[in-house]
């Protein structure tokens, strides 16, 4: 039984090593979490509801779509620098034009920095 457990654990670790771009995929997951949190601003807690216009909503959708597309391609082992640049541009649009809490603005700004660092590697 113990050897079976060790074998299963080793197989799991071996398959985890085959994931293309694991650090980048973790970064994209973090970006998506931060975008979702920012998009939820005004929809929970005691925060006065923020009226969203269609352009704000579309900026969130564009950034989430780009992040998802980029992650999908990374999972297939494909890295597209232009696609990453497009994602960074959409994140900048959210930061520059959407109503955000300071912590969300800071998190997304940090994400852009980290994406640029990844791109430079």
Predicted regions and their residues:
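Charged, low-complexity interaction regions
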Residues: 39-52, 75-79, 98-106
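Short, solvent-exposed mixed-charge patches
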Residues: 17, 120-121
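Short, charged, amphipathic alpha-helical segments
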Residues: 25, 50-61, 81-89, 105-113
